[in-house]
Design a protein with these regions (language model features):
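Short, acidic, metal-binding catalytic loop of nucleotide-sugar glycosyltransferases
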Residues: 23-32, 53-57
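Catalytic donor-sugar/metal-binding loop of nucleotide-sugar-dependent glycosyltransferases
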Residues: 223-224, 229-232, 238-260
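Short beta-strand-to-loop acidic/aromatic patch adjacent to the donor-nucleotide binding site
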Residues: 125-137
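Active-site-adjacent helix/loop segment of glycosyltransferases
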Residues: 164, 245-321
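Acidic donor-binding/catalytic loop of UDP-sugar-dependent glycosyltransferases
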Residues: 45, 136-149
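Active-site nucleotide-sugar/metal-binding loop of Leloir-type enzymes
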Residues: 111-128
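Acidic/His-rich active-site region of diverse nucleotide-sugar glycosyltransferases
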Residues: 95, 103, 112-115, 145-226, ...
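N-proximal low-complexity "stem/linker" segments adjacent to membrane-targeting elements
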Residues: 1-27, 83-87, 91-94
Length: 323
């Protein structure tokens, strides 16, 4: 018995990454999955390029997966936002691995964009929903390994793979994100409040959160199925996991399941808009702190002091993330 998994991918002006991700997914060994590709009103040629890829007119260059024409053309079902209410997901009538393309009328952002996909995915009554970033490439057995572990314990609510950097100075075996712990009482900045494990142990890890870049939810069992759209820039996944953990569900990182993620390098290196990004992190982390610590006001003096120090450090060009 292979429970059905609905995989949700969010695209915004990123068709090259998206078709590489799709190519890796259409070569996995797990037999029972569907892909819901949510386009957040891209302004480039994303939809046209994805059409070309599905038709076999556009190949994929990747160091992790070899392009094949054997599974082309790929059948897809495409819907504009005004037709979302008409979408039906009947796995019994059509058990093949299907691709749904949803075209949003505007850019709803990460949380709400994924929530649109989740809402539609739930119509098919899947056992699992997988949130997967479009700039990832998956190993062919990653989903089989995630499902095996998730099915092994009824208390598991969320599982995730080990995430490696797509390219770290030419290396592909450098862990970017495994899982982590959250200490609400410490400095509430993204890089300090959240402890990220960078060591891959043989045993799976019971943790506080796994990354929303690759997060599989046991949606038939868990009471919380959507991301908090009041948060943004990296905390939606942590918020969901913490809420489920508080309800008694386990959050498990499956160390034998692997994917590669491009975003980790860009976040690590930062950009010319670094101060703006840091201020966004400060804002959302304060919201997160308010949600998860009723005595958050006791930490505000320290919070304000450390915000000032953080701003000074960024202004003089020092690197923020802890290694």
């Amino acid at each position: 018995m292979n429970p059905n998994v609905k995989i949700i991918i969010l695209n915004w002006n990123g068709w090259e990454d998206t078709i590489e991700c799709l190519e890796s997914l259409f070569q996995i060994d797990y037999p029972n999955y569907d892909i819901i590709l949510v386009d957040n009103n891209s302004k480039d040629e994303s939809i046209e390029k994805i059409h070309d890829y599905c038709a076999g007119k556009l190949t994929v260059q990747s160091k992790f997966v070899s392009y094949t024409s054997e599974n082309k053309p790929i059948k897809y079902y495409e819907y504009s936002e005004k037709r979302y209410d008409t979408i039906e997901m009947d796995n019994k009538a059509d058990p093949s691995n299907k691709l749904y393309i949803l075209k949003n009328d505007k850019n709803y952002g990460f949380a709400e964009g994924n929530n649109i996909g989740i809402k539609i995915a739930l119509r098919g009554d899947p056992e699992y929903i997988m949130l997967l970033n479009n700039d990832t490439v998956v190993e062919n057995d990653f989903l089989s390994k995630l499902v095996t572990i998730a099915e092994s314990d009824k208390e598991i609510g969320v599982v995730g793979p080990v995430i490696y950097y797509y390219d770290w100075d030419g290396k592909t075996d450098v862990p970017s994100n495994i899982c982590g712990k959250v200490n609400i009482s410490s400095y509430p900045g993204y890089y300090d409040m959240v402890d990220v494990n960078k060591h891959v142990d043989p045993a799976n890890a019971d943790c506080d959160w796994v990354s929303g870049a690759a997060m599989m939810l046991k949606v038939r069992d868990i009471p919380i199925k959507y991301l908090n759209n009041q948060l943004f820039f990296g905390n939606e996944d942590i918020d969901l996991c913490i809420n489920l953990k508080n309800l008694g569900y386990k959050i498990i990182n499956v160390h034998s399941a692997r994917i590669w993620h491009k975003e980790g390098v860009s976040r690590k290196k930062r950009s010319s808009a670094v101060i703006k990004k840091v201020m966004m992190e400060i804002e959302v982390n304060l919201k997160f702190l308010k949600l998860h610590n009723k005595h958050y006001y006791l930490y505000l003096p320290l919070y304000l002091l450390q915000i000032t120090l953080l701003y000074i450090r960024v202004s003089i060009g020092k690197v923020l993330p802890k290694n």
